[in-house]
Regions:
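Rossmann-like NAD(P)H-binding beta-loop-alpha module
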Residues: 57-100, 105
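Short, glycine/serine-rich, charged loops/turns that create anion-binding
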Residues: 33, 79, 109
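A Rossmann-like FAD-binding core segment of flavoenzymes
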Residues: 3, 92-175
Length: 175
């Protein structure tokens, strides 16, 4: 297992203390979503990383929407939140008995690091599909079925998807 990478010496250091030199290196180590804002049991709370978690989320959406209309909250204001919202909408439109209501809780500003043109086009695309985007406030805590904002306001959701603060695994932090 990789511990760290030294690009200066072009060496990969393993946890076993073995060293592997390289000429060219491709790193596909993945990333994860911090779960620090989740308290208590995490039933029906799914991070977007690793990708296997999204498969479980999809199965749960199909299961619940076969019985009733549900609400889905997506935590995050970047490309992952936008992409997963669109994918959930498509899943709902073509495969769900009951279309879910989808809300993105994006923190201060949705797609903040992008130009206003890009941001407004994405917002328009989501809005015309009935996907709500809430801005201007960060999430303080998440429990099963409940998203609490910093103001204390609570949003009740049947399923919660975490697409915020995606981090690379520690191999790059050590390198």
């Amino acid at each position: 297992r990789v511990d760290r990478i030294d690009p200066e010496s072009k060496t990969v250091y393993l946890e076993s203390e073995k060293m592997i030199p390289y000429d060219t290196l491709s790193c596909n180590v993945g990333s994860y979503v911090p779960m620090t804002i989740v308290s208590g049991a995490d039933r029906d709370i799914f991070p977007v990383k690793p990708i296997e978690k999204l498969i479980h989320f999809q199965e749960r959406v199909l299961e619940l929407t076969s019985q009733q209309k549900i609400t889905i909250g997506i935590i995050g204001g970047g490309p992952s939140a936008a992409e997963t919202a669109g994918n959930i909408w498509r899943l709902g439109k073509y495969y769900c008995k009951n279309m879910p209501d989808i809300t993105i809780l994006s923190g201060q500003k949705f797609m903040a690091r992008f130009t206003e043109n890009v941001r407004s086009r994405i917002l328009h695309s989501l809005t015309k599909r009935g996907i709500e985007t809430l801005e201007q406030e960060f999430v303080r805590e998440i429990k099963t079925g409940e998203i609490t904002m910093e103001s204390g306001q609570v949003h009740h959701k049947d399923l919660i998807l975490l697409a915020h603060g995606i981090k690379p695994y520690t191999v790059f932090q050590k390198s």
